[in-house]
UniProtKB/Swiss-Prot annotation:
Chain ranges passing through the membrane: none
CDD domains assigned: PseudoU_synth_TruC
Xref: InterPro entries: PsdUridine_synth_cat_dom_sf (IPR020103), PsdUridine_synth_RluA-like_CS (IPR006224), PsdUridine_synth_RsuA/RluA (IPR006145), RluA_PseudoU_synthase (IPR050188)
Identification of the protein by name: tRNA pseudouridine synthase C
Keyword tRNA processing: yes
EC assignment: 5.4.99.26
UniProt keyword annotations, A-Z: Isomerase, tRNA processing
Organism of provenance: Haemophilus ducreyi (strain 35000HP / ATCC 700724)
Active site: D55
Enzyme class: isomerase
Record's keyword annotation contains tRNA processing: yes
The encoding gene: truC
One Gene Ontology MF term: RNA binding
One GO BP: tRNA processing
Reactions performed catalytically: uridine(65) in tRNA = pseudouridine(65) in tRNA
Length: 243
């Protein structure tokens, strides 16, 4: 497959990562054969260096460096929370118009890779959110005759593992399609009614200062077909959120 390249200069390159694709090889997923890092390397015939990650089921802007020095410089920006990130999510229910989630999250240890590690104290985790649109659909997923969803812009100010997914669960507005932190019954009903079967979380935008040129860079990624399908069914207009 060929990846959609969103931005490229002499030292950085960004793609629109498809949902379901791992960023790089992992011994925990030995059966996988398709990875964003290796696919991009083969596509541009040049080695690329990882800077940050997106969860496997998350789509959107994924940035790589084209040399190790740039990878180090950009990684420092991410670690120092100097990179602005914005995600789109579709969540269950009507969420408040906007707010800040300041809820510490425990470090998630892998059962195999971290089997000898000791549990760690919860770390600070902060996410800002804004409700962009709401919809009430004429089908039941529980005790009510209708089902409500919200389109939310999420801006994490820290970078904890699964932060957005865990914070939405904490608010009792889980992200639709989330098989780990979401409502499995609601997920199944959404698939039955709409045909959508992915995590509805998309890394829409990255904004940062280029370490070498000092230019302000903004990179945005369009939504895939399943997102566009839901927008159509929910009566949301694509151009209202991408400009």
């Amino acid at each position: 497959m060929e990846l959609d390249i969103l931005y490229r200069d002499d030292e950085l390159i960004a793609i629109n990562k498809p949902a379901g694709m791992l960023v790089h090889r992992s011994w925990l997923d030995k059966a996988e054969t398709l990875f964003a890092m290796q696919t991009l390397r083969d596509q541009i015939n040049q080695h690329v260096f990882p800077i940050h990650r997106l969860d496997r089921p998350t789509s959107g802007v994924l940035l790589f460096a084209l040399n190790s020095e740039m990878a180090r410089l950009m990684s420092e920006q991410f670690e120092q929370h100097k990179v602005e990130k914005e995600y789109l999510a579709i969540v269950r229910g009507y969420i408040a118009e906007k707010g800040e989630i300041d809820y510490p999250l425990k470090v998630i240890l892998d059962k195999i890779a971290d089997k000898f590690s000791q549990p760690k104290a919860a770390q600070q985790a902060v996410t800002f959110y804004q409700n962009l649109a709401k919809v009430e659909m004429p089908y039941s997923t529980g005790k009510y005759a209708t089902t409500r969803y919200s389109l939310v812009a999420l801006s994490p100010k820290t970078g904890r593992k699964h932060q957005l997914r865990r914070h939405m669960k904490h608010l009792f507005h889980p992200i639709m399609g989330d098989t780990k932190y979401g409502d499995l019954h609601q997920n199944r009903r959404l698939t039955e009614k709409t045909g959508c079967n992915r995590l509805m979380l998309h890394a829409r935008l990255l904004h940062f200062t280029h370490p070498k040129t000092l230019q302000k860079i903004t990179i945005s990624a369009l939504l895939d077909q399943q997102w566009q399908m839901l927008f159509n069914q929910f009566g949301w207009h694509f151009t209202d959120f991408f400009y």
